[in-house]
Amino acid sequence: MTNGSFRQIINQLDMRWRRRVPVIHQTETAECGLACLAMICGHFGKNIDLISLRRKFNLSARGANLAGINGIAEQLGMVTRALSLELDELGALKMPCILHWDFSHFVVLVSVKRNRYVLHDPARGRRYLGREEMSRYFTGIALEVWPGSEFLAETQQIRISLRSLINSIYGIKRTLAKIFCLSVVIEAINLVMPVGTQLVMDHAIPAGDRGLLTLISAGLMFFILLRAAVSMLRAWSSLVMSTLINIQWQSGLFNHLLRLPLAFFERRKLGDIQSRFGSLDTLRATFTTCVVGAIMDSIMVVGVFVMMLLYGGYLTWIVLGFTMVYVLIRLVTYGYYRQISEETLVRGARASSYFMESLYGIATVKIQGMAGIRGTHWLNLKIDAINSGIKLTKMDLLFGGINTFVAACDQVAILWLGASLVIDNQMTIGMFVAFGSFRGQFSDRVASLTSFLLQLRIMSLHNERIADIALHEKEEKKPEIEIVADMSPVSLETTDLSYRYDSQSAQVFSGLNLSVAPGESVAITGASGAGKTTLMKVLCGLFEPDSGKVLVNGTDIRQLGINNYHRMIACVMQDDRLFSGSIRENICGFAEETDDEWMTECARASHIHDVIMKMPMGYETLIGELGEGLSGGQKQRIFIARALYRKPGILFMDEATSSLDTESERFVNAAIKKMNITRVIIAHRETTLRTVDRIISI
């Protein structure tokens, strides 16, 4: 037997008393199947995160069916068995196993005891259900999964190290060093203060020496003033550090987010992305408020422990014993605390996504009479998030109560034992009072340090959420080349172009060969759902093809660079958006320097200039992010004007005139045709199709 095979067998052995099934929440809207497999793999010792699974098995926003999950499980070295069964037969399954849930979801069945079912839901976390609710959602399909001969228990997790995050901040090391030095001064003063109290009680008071009392008091006052001044300086330095971290982390992550491929956003909910971005604030707050304090707590724990040994002898070990009770309680309950923390974040993000979705579709909500339903559903989601937060608060209150109780017991025990030592003349009153002060500092510092260390572990949760954005591969950016934006027509060609949404789905199109000459206008037609918009996004460089090439003027757009290619083209898509600002800013792309004459010409070509001029503020008219106050046709004409303002060599239009009346559509098509630029159009209207040189059906 080789060392490698022996190591594999050792990894597969589980010598623990109990195998846990981890709770893993899905990130994308349709990756519940991947999350279920990640949980089962974790149960059998293969700790693999969703980022790793996603990179290996690229699923689309449409998700995967049971056959797809079965195929992925086999590639992970698992053995599977699909079953159709009744609810009463669930207890006979090999658990954990995967259940088909509510005809559109997958969950992991962890255990069945009497009529109590424990599930790990990728969308909601750990759930305890009764028979009635199980009967309502279980579809009768289950998938048993267990390790096969090729299964390897290992760790495959992609994460961001805290060190790399810290090292990426300019000026952080100098600021940290300053804060550390100031903290040393403050903590040294804290150690001196009890000694001053002891000197007063053991020397100044028994001797009746007012001069010594005055000298000690003056010295203590000096140290108090010094501590206040240094504390203010440290607070200012902490503010500087917090600002440095906040700006650099958030700007870096936001810039990275904007450069991610379109598919990343299509598979996620906006509220979840916003929640993950907000995890930066938690990391920043934890780092700026706790890291330096934790370092000083560590130093002080050692220093105070030594002082306690010098002053109290064996009393120190009693204090240590009481303190360890609290530490052990926190360590034992950490797993549950982390699980609730993650559920709170996920449920809050889900409620936020639903809230934003309702606002974006407010017109539909009103027209369809869905206000009551949407309001009730949002309230239920919010209550779920609040309940998770309440659980977290309860645990914090419980820990606070336990800490107070343990500290009180410790204080009473030390009071009795210490007073006995004083009565027996084995300790002076001053030493006893000083020891009590050191005891309080030791207990508080250990409790604070324990909370920080556990908080540091909780930070890994936020780290994982940020990693989903930060470690996602962004679009490749090539060095910018000089491109003259003068509407010179360019050629467009595809060779053996193929695309499918993911490895589990059929190809949308394959072996596609197109050729569009410079200045030619081509219309792409086909039945709804045939893949016209998907093809348009591939041609625009928004989606990357599985195989084949897209060539512009004979150059592969990947070789040219998507960033350079986008400077040569303009697109008007079905789901285009206006941004909060003026009409001028939207047409000119919020550029600092604008060409008003060309802007007006583009607006005239789009048949929107006269409409804009009738508005009280003309081109300075403000519009909201949803384009309030504008009709669908007016928005589309502004979209077209915005595209023309870029002076593109190719203009892509996906149903760009579908909301226009016949006269406006005829005018816009004629005006664009006169510009003699290359056009690729998706359209169904005969009036638009008559303006093109060639029609391609797919």
UniProtKB/Swiss-Prot annotation:
ATP binds at residues 526-533. Residues 176-458 form the ABC transmembrane type-1 domain. GO terms for molecular function: ABC-type transporter activity; ATP binding; ATP hydrolysis activity; ATPase-coupled lipid transmembrane transporter activity; cysteine-type peptidase activity. It is found in: Cell membrane. The active site is at residue 32. Keywords: ATP-binding, Bacteriocin transport, Cell membrane, Hydrolase, Membrane, Nucleotide-binding, Protease, Protein transport, Thiol protease, Translocase, Transmembrane, Transmembrane helix, Transport. The keyword Transmembrane helix applies. GO terms for cellular component: plasma membrane. Residues 26-145 form the Peptidase C39 domain. It comes from the Bacteria. One of its GO terms (biological process) is bacteriocin transport. Residues 492-698 form the ABC transporter domain. It is a multi-pass membrane protein. The chain crosses the membrane at residues 33-53, 90-110, 289-311, 315-337, 397-417. PANTHER family: ATP-BINDING CASSETTE SUB-FAMILY B (PTHR24221), COLICIN V SECRETION-PROCESSING ATP-BINDING PROTEIN (PTHR24221:SF606). Belongs to the ABC transporter superfamily. Probably involved, in conjunction with MchE, in the secretion of microcin H47. This is Probable microcin-H47 secretion/processing ATP-binding protein MchF. It comes from Escherichia coli. The gene is mchF.
